[in-house]
């Protein structure tokens, strides 16, 4: 009897191996059950130069076209939070809070001219401050030849004193009132009139429908601690959000507001 069981088990094992070794062919008819998906599901971040003196190259435009790019986020991330569209300036929290030129008008025009139909996303500023001038930048070139080091996050614009030991704690913080100005909900949504309104630049709002509601507000007390040393309560931030959102939608009913954008 024991031999019979052994033979049975061997035959069963051989049969299982034979069955499991069979090739299974699955045919998929890709023409069936197809559903449209948004062309904006795929995108890239910060691709278009906003500096007329250093434009996006022909090779870069060619690469984006060949990749099938349909959506590009162009607000500059951390540098979006204090962008002043009137003066075309922004404060750089990852580089001493220094203020440098950025021209969103130029970037939006180049995107529209070079890749018609591609959606470009810019941003509204909700923190309440925007860059006002370049006169109070920390002289990073004189300090160390503009070399990156662990202290680039120190708040040195506005007359600060560098802490040579590094880290993000300056010996003396700069005065943000020297390089920033107040920036209300009316101020930030005014770019919609500038781009789309009567007497404005007459940009195609259908290709600039998506707007980021600032950038990473959950870490403002780190990236923008010059004006927000304590993290705002969620309710306080949402009131800033709602104030700008209502004014933006009143000017541009078909606008698509995105965010809050978390870190």
Q: Where on the chain are the PLM-derived regions?
A:
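Bacterial Sec-dependent N-terminal signal peptides
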Residues: 1-22
């Amino acid at each position: 009897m024991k031999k019979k069981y052994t033979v049975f088990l061997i035959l069963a094992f051989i049969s299982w191996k034979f069955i499991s070794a069979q090739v299974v062919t699955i045919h998929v008819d890709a023409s069936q059950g197809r559903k449209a998906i948004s062309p904006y599901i795929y995108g890239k971040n910060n691709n278009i130069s906003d500096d007329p003196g250093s434009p996006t190259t022909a090779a870069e435009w060619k690469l984006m076209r060949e990749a099938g790019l349909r959506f590009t986020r162009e607000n500059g991330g951390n540098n979006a939070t204090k962008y002043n569209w009137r003066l075309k300036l922004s404060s750089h929290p990852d580089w001493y809070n220094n203020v440098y030129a950025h021209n969103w008008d130029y970037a939006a025009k180049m995107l529209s001219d070079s890749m018609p139909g591609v959606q470009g996303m810019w941003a509204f500023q909700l923190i309440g401050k925007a860059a006002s001038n370049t006169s109070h930048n920390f002289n990073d070139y004189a300090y160390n030849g503009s070399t990156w080091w662990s202290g680039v996050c120190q708040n040195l614009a506005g007359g600060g004193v560098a802490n040579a030991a590094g880290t993000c704690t300056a010996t003396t913080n700069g005065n943000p009132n020297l390089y920033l100005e107040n920036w209300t909900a009316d101020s930030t949504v005014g770019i919609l009139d500038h781009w789309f309104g009567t007497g404005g630049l007459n940009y195609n709002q259908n290709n600039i429908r998506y707007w980021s509601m600032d950038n990473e507000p959950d870490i403002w007390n780190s990236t923008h601690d010059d004006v927000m040393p304590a993290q705002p309560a969620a309710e306080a931030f949402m009131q800033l959000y709602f104030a700008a959102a209502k004014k933006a939608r009143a000017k541009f009913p078909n606008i698509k507001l995105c965010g809050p954008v978390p870190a």
